[in-house]
Curated annotation (Swiss-Prot):
It comes from Danio rerio. Coiled coil: none annotated. PROSITE patterns: HOMEOBOX_1, HOMEOBOX_2. Belongs to the Abd-B homeobox family. This is Homeobox protein Hox-C11a. It is found in: Nucleus. Its main location: nucleus.
């Protein structure tokens, strides 16, 4: 009897508990969000989230607001991360064209909340802004700086690095141009200074050996030298010999430094030259060999007085 009474009480209690739990479940079912339903549940905002989070932001979208059941889902997804940790961007950045993304820094200044609450006006402003407007960039796009990779805190390093490389490149270009000008101005003077002593003994030998030079010719030569001394002298091509003629003359000079008359006439007939041309060429070649031997001895001995 006692057991039956207790069982009856237990059964009655369990039935009451079951009915109360079922009532609670039915009450909660009225607050459950069903995406297949077309009605809007106003009690959804009262449901607490299971994760610790900051105050979630309400976002309005440029499309029609008839699909209002999507908004709480967006609200929950944006509320997962703390509001102070990350700077949220618009989800439609991938849908914008390249020009819209390039001119994203030209938006009028406003706070983050205003930008998020007025997303529709921002989207329309992307298509109607003027490229010449120079408004400061807002907090809505503070995640990325000028280098499109690092935050804006690294912009000063980015600018100094680029300025230093630009200045170095410009400085190097200026130095190279100055060096080119200096070398170009010094080269003809050095060449003329090096060729003048080579030319003078040859000219002297030609004038002394030919016997055709007079005092008037020397005066004219001195006058021409004085007139051209101010300008960089470039040695004119005075050699009328061909490569074949020079090769044969050099071969004969290698065997005989001083050529006799018979060999000289033979070379003149073979090379289609005059006797005088062959004789003058050998004289000049001997002076050149003498100068080369002197320079060679000075180079190997190291004595500049020779």
């Amino acid at each position: 009897m006692f057991n039956s009474v207790n069982l009856g009480n237990f059964c009655s209690q369990t039935r009451k508990d079951r009915t109360s739990e079922f009532g609670d479940r039915t009450g909660c079912a009225s607050n459950i969000y069903l995406p297949s339903c077309t009605y809007y549940v106003p009690e959804f905002s009262a449901v607490s989230s299971f994760l610790p989070q900051g105050p979630s932001r309400q976002i309005t979208y440029p499309y029609s607001t008839n699909l209002s059941q999507v908004q709480p889902v967006r609200d929950v997804s944006y509320g997962l991360d703390p509001s102070s940790k990350w700077h949220h961007r618009s989800n439609y950045a991938s849908c914008y064209s390249g020009e819209d993304l390039v001119h994203r820094d030209c938006l009028p200044p406003s706070t983050m909340t205003e930008m998020l609450m007025k997303n529709e006006s921002v989207y329309s402003h992307h298509h109607q802004h003027h490229p010449n407007s120079s408004h400061p960039s807002t907090g809505f796009y503070t995640g990325v700086g000028k280098n499109n990779v690092l935050p804006q805190g690294f912009d000063r390093f980015f600018e100094t690095a680029y300025c230093s490389t630009d200045n170095q490149s410009e400085h190097c270009l200026q130095k190279s141009e100055m060096n080119k000008l200096e070398t170009s101005s010094q080269q003809p003077t050095a060449v003329s200074a090096a060729r003048e002593p080579e030319k003078d003994p040859e000219d002297e030998e030609e004038h002394t050996n030919s016997g055709s030079c007079t005092s008037a010719a020397t005066k004219d030569g001195n006058a021409s030298k004085s007139s051209h001394s101010s300008t960089p002298r470039t040695r004119k091509k005075r050699c009328p010999y061909s490569k074949f003629q020079i090769r044969e003359l050099e071969r004969e000079f290698f065997f005989n430094v001083y050529i006799n008359k018979e060999k000289r006439l033979q070379l003149s007939r073979m090379l289609n030259l005059t006797d005088r041309q062959v004789k003058i060429w050998f004289q000049n070649r001997r002076m050149k060999e003498k100068k080369l031997s002197r320079d060679r001895l000075q180079y190997f001995s190291g004595n500049p007085l020779l």
